[in-house]
């Protein structure tokens, strides 16, 4: 689960980190009042969406009058912002963040992720702030400094000082940087974060360290013990199909192809997508119905797949271990009858009650094609989708 910038900065303030005075606004009138409250004659106005690249898309602007604040809010509130990280529809803008303007002398990068290889939280810092860190990692990886956090002792001040000195900061700035580093480390652990970025972390004209941006991602598996964070969820930023799948505890990720996939087990789902690709097709989604799938969940999974208008055929690949193939077959039949499926459905059943499941599908009288093997299923679904 991701947070908006203004929500991330609320958490930053909770941990004593330096952020700009700012207010998230729902209307143009609120935006103007926020600018008046902040004072001055220059403000920064930002569209609040769960996507990067806002500045290049016109979603971040420096304004020098209250009329410009109002105009920006009226331009974007209720509209969709399209960036290089969104699809062609973009993300809806429901709030505008109005902030005081910060003078910038230098830009840095500071972020943290959970490194699965080392099984530790890893902080990354760079002098290349204000640009995509992925670009820096690819072109000049030596400019990225790292500090691994030992989970048995937690983050240590010396690690922050070491990063600060390597970034070329002055002793006073290193002290400020270390405070930011320790606050972020505490926040990362306390709120079960999966990703944390400040890009840029700036040095002001006065020589102070300042958090100019906030990108925060939470481990969704930990939300059950984070009620405060759970309340910050903005469902308008979620893919509608992914949100519906989450209600049924289905693991669904929308993709760009035209072959819908429904599989039990994440590994088998990945393998199914691979063989579809190798056979000349393009998967429209990743969908794992899980080992304990019920008839109702299978039916809902089918409806979610078919809600994507780009889907031209569906491949169902089930290995019956915990889940029974005949129950999956009943779910498929129920969904096909309820939704009124117009696209071919190719089904490969193997394992627990596979023969009974195949029999039920064959006797249904629906447009369902049985496959003898996974490779056969992939060939048939690619052909059914037009080989695209």
UniProtKB/Swiss-Prot annotation:
Q: Source organism's superkingdom?
A: Bacteria
PROSITE patterns registered for this protein in UniProt? ATP_GRASP, SUCCINYL_COA_LIG_3
The processes (GO biological process) annotated in the record are:
succinyl-CoA metabolic process; tricarboxylic acid cycle
Q: Which residues does the UniProt record annotate as the domain ATP-grasp?
A: 9-244
Q: What is its EC number?
A: 6.2.1.5
**Keyword Disulfide bond attached:** no
Any GO molecular function: ATP binding
Obligatory cofactor(s):
Mg(2+)
Q: Which residues bind ATP?
A: 46, 53-55, 99, 102, 107
Q: How is the cofactor bound?
A: Binds 1 Mg(2+) ion per subunit.
Q: Which UniProt keywords apply?
A: ATP-binding, Ligase, Magnesium, Metal-binding, Nucleotide-binding, Tricarboxylic acid cycle
Query: Which residues does the record give as substrate binding sites?
Result: 264, 321-323
One Pfam family linked to the record: ATP-grasp_2
Q: Does the keyword Lipid biosynthesis apply?
A: no
List residues binding Mg(2+).
Answer: 199, 213
Query: What function is annotated for this protein?
Result: Succinyl-CoA synthetase functions in the citric acid cycle (TCA), coupling the hydrolysis of succinyl-CoA to the synthesis of either ATP or GTP and thus represents the only step of substrate-level phosphorylation in the TCA. The beta subunit provides nucleotide specificity of the enzyme and binds the substrate succinate, while the binding sites for coenzyme A and phosphate are found in the alpha subunit.
User: Which protein family is it in?
Assistant: Belongs to the succinate/malate CoA ligase beta subunit family.
Subunit and interaction comment: Heterotetramer of two alpha and two beta subunits.
Name assigned to this protein:
Succinate--CoA ligase [ADP-forming] subunit beta
What high-level taxonomic lineage is stated for the organism?
Answer: Bacteria, Pseudomonadati, Pseudomonadota, Gammaproteobacteria, Alteromonadales
